[in-house]
């Protein structure tokens, strides 16, 4: 899978995604992550990529020209499945969406900044707007990193144990059940006996019951009638 991220702060994403599991996925050729400095596509003497909005509103707006140049250039090199804009206005990013996007081959992610982007970019260049939550960040870099991490870990071979991803929170619209490791007892706090029993069917039943209980208690909005 290849993900091209367009940003004015590539180092912010690079520092996050070039280490640990996602960094190793790149080293092993399972994920190709390319960061593009948007300012390199500005023809302005000062490499500016923003300007004042028409109509006199406060703030600055990302210009259409440099964004069009980089997206057009990328599209001459390969076919992209989606051109995504990180925006609080977009559809909510969740585990099913991560699953869906992980099955694609090539993605472009445009990180928003300032007041927003020239609306013509949304109308003519973007295929999908995605939000990681109902709040506003200083830029779309953190959102792009969050989405990339969630998507990349689902690519076959990225996780050493593929079953780990399948049992994650939200995969069945349920929170994950509790997990424990050695020692079996610490300061009088014991691991549930069922997990030490070795009875796989009973353990599976316990895990499902715990997942349902935790979901009802912590995220009742996930429980469907």
UniProtKB/Swiss-Prot annotation:
GO BP annotation list: tRNA N1-guanine methylation
GO cellular component, one term: cytosol
Reaction catalysis annotation: guanosine(37) in tRNA + S-adenosyl-L-methionine = N(1)-methylguanosine(37) in tRNA + S-adenosyl-L-homocysteine + H(+)
Pfam families reported in the protein's UniProt record: tRNA_m1G_MT
Compartment(s) of residence: Cytoplasm
Residues involved in S-adenosyl-L-methionine binding: 112, 132-137
Entry's Gene Ontology molecular function annotations: tRNA (guanine(37)-N1)-methyltransferase activity
Entry keyword set: Cytoplasm, Methyltransferase, S-adenosyl-L-methionine, Transferase, tRNA processing
Disulfide bond residue pairs: none
Record EC number: 2.1.1.228
Family to which this protein belongs: Belongs to the RNA methyltransferase TrmD family.
Subunit details: Homodimer.
Record protein name field: tRNA (guanine-N(1)-)-methyltransferase
Species per Swiss-Prot/TrEMBL record: Porphyromonas gingivalis (strain ATCC BAA-308 / W83)
Species lineage: Bacteria, Pseudomonadati, Bacteroidota, Bacteroidia, Bacteroidales
């Amino acid at each position: 899978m290849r993900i091209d991220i367009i940003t004015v702060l590539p180092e912010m994403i690079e520092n996050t995604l070039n280490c640990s599991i996602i960094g190793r996925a790149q080293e092993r050729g399972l994920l190709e992550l390319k960061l593009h400095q948007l300012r390199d596509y500005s023809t302005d003497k000062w490499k500016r990529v923003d300007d004042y909005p028409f109509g006199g509103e406060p703030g600055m707006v990302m210009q259409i020209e440099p964004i069009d140049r980089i997206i057009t250039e990328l599209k001459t090199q390969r076919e992209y499945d989606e051109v995504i804009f990180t925006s609080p206005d977009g559809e909510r990013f969740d585990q099913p969406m991560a699953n869906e996007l992980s099955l694609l081959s090539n993605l472009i992610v445009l990180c928003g900044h300032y007041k927003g982007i020239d609306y013509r970019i949304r109308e003519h260049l973007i295929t999908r707007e995605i939000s990681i939550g109902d709040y506003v960040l200083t830029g779309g870099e953190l959102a792009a990193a969050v989405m990339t991490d969630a998507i990349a870990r689902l690519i076959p071979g990225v996780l050493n144990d593929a079953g780990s991803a399948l049992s994650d929170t939200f995969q069945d619209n349920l929170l994950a059940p509790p997990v424990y490791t050695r020692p079996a007892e610490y300061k009088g706090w014991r691991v549930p006996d069922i997990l030490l029993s070795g009875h796989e069917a009973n353990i599976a039943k316990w895990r499902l019951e715990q997942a349902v209980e935790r979901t009802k208690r912590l995220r009742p909005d996930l429980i469907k009638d």
